[in-house]
Amino acid sequence: VQSFEVTEAAVAVFVYMPSAAQPVAPPLDLPKELTDPEWAGFLCTSPWQCNSRYTLDNLVDPMHGCYLHAQSFTLAYGSKQDIMKLDKTQSGFVVSRVAQAGENFDWTEMTFGASTYCRLDLPYPAAAGPGGMFRIIGYVLPVDEHNCTVFFWRLRKCSGLARDSWRFLYRALFEERHWNVLEQDREMLSAMPDDARKREMLYQHDVGVSRIRLVLKQMARDQLAAEDAAAMRSAV
């Protein structure tokens, strides 16, 4: 019977799936927002009937917010035209809009390592009360070729009365609205055919999509190389 390294944190259970390159689980390195008590939030998770790569493509395409979610509570503002830029980080990259910030879904940061996750901010209108931007930390778990499960922590950095007010408003009013936005993503991605990439036409806004595909392709090559090396060692 195979066992796995399991850690409970941030109201979730993290299971390490060993690989030939990393058979022993490294320390669980969570995003700061999931360990810092100054951040308050809620975890939402949902099974999606689409390949996990479609979900990742969607997350690194900030321009989709002002189109797909144009009638939503948080994403109805800002320009529908812009240029995207990509900046490398020590552990991944950030893709962001050039001409605006803080008006819509304007940037995504991807982090790669023992786990892959994204970080992004959404603007909150004045009706949401004090507390600043609405941050999302997202993980995408592949299930099989046609299914994945998404985990999104919805967070806000606030304290005292602002924290209590936001948590109350989220449960009483905002949660349903945020789920409606997530459903728009799920329905769109679930309706995409498996071979959609064969008919796509990428353009400048898709610089994040192109980048994450290159990263994932290299990660797959490294994994296959590690498995081949492990098989050769076992055969000796």
Please provide the spans of the model-predicted regions.
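Short Fe-S-cluster ligation motifs
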Residues: 1-20
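C-terminal catalytic domain of Rieske-type non-heme iron oxygenases
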Residues: 21-236
